[in-house]
UniProtKB/Swiss-Prot annotation:
Catalysed transformations (reactions): 7-aminomethyl-7-carbaguanosine(34) in tRNA + S-adenosyl-L-methionine = epoxyqueuosine(34) in tRNA + adenine + L-methionine + 2 H(+)
HAMAP family found in the cross-reference section: QueA (MF_00113)
GO biological-process terms attached to the record: queuosine biosynthetic process; tRNA wobble guanine modification
Name of this protein: S-adenosylmethionine:tRNA ribosyltransferase-isomerase
Length: 356
């Protein structure tokens, strides 16, 4: 398919610059992927689509304060965005400066941290932090929250709370798994009382999630890699639910990618499916899984997501899940009805199973 198949015009005023006043006070567009039918709902209506024994899978990654400002050893200004912490003193990072720094050069960040540029690979730099404290501790102390590039306002103190899910537990992401931002403790408690099973995966969202696809043929796109983890407990929850007729709802494209990566991981190793028809394996690793129309989903029955950028890999993923023409119609409807788009925007529920 061509990149033009995933392009659309979005009025700038529909890009949400702030979250809803209260978590969960968002609209939700429901798409029945089988019939193509659309319903305008509220996020508070989510429980009406679920039943006891269903599994909701959340991404429990936590956004780190990954952005640092400083100067180079030449005196020029520099901005560093940590993409991934490699060990206690090294990180993979993007650097914005008037000229690309060379290996061996120094950066002085936040007035307190000396950093050595070790090497460059695939557009990122490997940096060594010359400090007795570890990278994570330094980021927490001196870093800034990395809001998405389409948020055209300064970071506010409230963003440290609202650009983080209430269940965030494992630091490592440079972007929030934004479908999860709609959930508050009240909604989670309500779902538990209903008998809906809560499960977690971890996928540390990288900055590549915001990058548009720049090739004409999407098959030529090189997908960014992200670290993920799927526990044995989550795998068992999914297998049990499927065996009993339950459905699996992935909260966000990152949860879906982690589950499908784990399923691909199992398939590569010819793992047995325990007779329940679900081939998925626990484990940790890196994934560059690129989900486009024609992909055969192995685990997920329904997807809760936000509205995505034109020409993005995430729009391709939801088009694969909900159907290309269905998603086009849904996005046209969302624009007409003035839904709020992107990270702080409204939700979309896409069902591929009976009853959702």
């Amino acid at each position: 398919m061509k990149i033009q198949d995933f392009d659309f015009d979005l009025p700038p005023e529909l890009i949400a610059q702030f979250p809803a006043e209260k978590r969960g006070n968002s609209r939700m567009l429901h798409l029945d992927a089988t019939s193509g039918a659309l319903q305008d709902r509220m996020f508070a209506d989510l429980p009406s689509y679920l039943r006891p024994g269903d599994v909701i899978v959340f991404n429990d990654t936590r956004v780190i304060k990954a952005r640092l400002y400083g100067v180079r050893d030449t005196g020029g200004r520099v901005e560093v965005l940590v993409e991934r912490v490699l060990d206690s003193h090294c990180a993979l990072a993007a650097i914005r400066a008037s000229h690309s720094p060379k290996p061996g050069s120094k950066l002085f960040l936040a007035g307190a941290i000396e950093v050595t540029v070790l090497s460059r690979e695939h557009g990122f730099y490997i940096l060594q932090f010359e400090h007795e404290s570890g990278v994570m501790e330094l980021l927490e102390r001196y870093g800034n929250l990395p809001l998405p590039p389409y948020i055209s306002r300064p970071v506010e103190k409230s963003d440290e709370l609202r650009y983080q899910t209430v269940y965030a537990a494992r630091p490592g992401a440079v972007a929030a798994p934004t479908a999860g931002l709609h959930f508050d403790e009240h909604m989670l408690g309500l779902l538990r009382k209903m008998g809906v099973v809560m499960a977690h995966v971890t996928l540390h969202v990288g900055s590549g999630t915001f990058q548009p696809v720049r090739v004409e043929n999407i098959a030529d796109h090189r997908m960014h890699s992200e670290v993920f983890y799927v526990s044995a407990e989550t795998v068992e929850c999914i297998r049990h639910a499927k065996a009993e007729g339950g459905r699996v709802l992935a909260v966000g494209t990152t949860s879906l990618r982690a589950l499908e990566a784990a399923a691909a991981f199992a398939g590569e190793r010819a793992e047995a499916d325990n007779g329940d028809g679900v081939r998925i394996k626990c484990g940790a690793g890196e994934t560059d899984i690129f989900i486009t129309p024609g992909y055969q989903f192995r685990v997920v029955d329904c997807l809760l997501t936000n509205f995505h950028l034109p020409r993005s890999t995430l729009l391709m993923l939801v088009s694969a899940f909900g159907g290309v023409e269905n998603i086009r119609c849904a996005y046209r409807h969302a624009i007409k009805e003035r839904y709020r788009f992107f990270s702080f925007g409204d939700a979309m529920l896409i069902g591929r199973a009976e009853g959702i």
